[in-house]
Regions:
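Glycine-rich, low-complexity intrinsically disordered segments
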Residues: 1-192
Length: 192
């Protein structure tokens, strides 16, 4: 198959740029995270609802396709390898009831109990799904990312200090992701 030749770019104007940015650009502060805790880490609807407000930072997910280098007579042929999914991190504002942090701590303890090193061995019992909703300026969902089979591997420390005033505690949670799918604008995958 012949490679397509591209013409040199034409002179662009700000009006051309404006016509392409029809939605005004996606905003990184317009999002909502929905967490679900598995049955081994029971949490009530209050915790799930609070998480929609108190998860203050997250990321749209990354994935990677590793190259496989195949040597041939002094040259390297690059072949697409396996796809992997990065760890997903959320930052949570800690409320005085410690509800969200407590739910994550219970989840991790159910996976590996600190008292006797026992825990749930069936992955379907300790994994759950999570969602990130990217919103527009009207609060409508532009795109949804569904993270499949997540589980926490790190609940960060919370720094305590006498000289920390005018601030609220925060902590991060690192979750392992089996895979993710995106739904909505820009290359839809069929919604679940």
């Amino acid at each position: 198959m012949a490679r397509q030749q591209l013409n040199p770019p034409a002179l662009r104007k700000i009006s051309d740029f404006k016509s392409k940015l029809t939605g005004g650009g996606a905003r990184p502060n317009l999002f909502e995270v929905s967490l679900a805790f598995p049955g081994i880490a029971p949490s009530d609807n209050n915790v799930l609802d609070k998480a929609r407000f108190l998860v203050k930072a997250a990321a749209l997910p990354a994935s990677n396709v590793a190259p496989i280098d195949v040597p041939f007579r002094g040259r390297i042929l690059k072949i697409a390898g396996d796809r992997t999914f990065d760890t997903w991190t959320v930052t949570v504002i800690n409320d005085t009831d410690f509800a969200i942090r407590g739910a994550f701590e219970k989840w991790m303890n159910a996976i590996n109990n600190v008292a006797d090193a026992t825990g749930e061995s069936n992955p379907s019992n300790y994994k759950s799904d999570a969602y990130v909703f990217q919103l527009n300026r009207e609060g409508e969902t532009l795109r949804t990312y569904r993270f499949y089979d997540v589980f926490p591997t790190n609940v960060s420390q919370i720094e305590l200090s006498y000289d920390s005033s005018d601030t609220i505690e925060e902590f991060t949670v690192e979750l392992q992701v089996q895979y993710w799918e995106a739904y909505g604008e820009g290359g839809d995958i069929t919604a679940p």
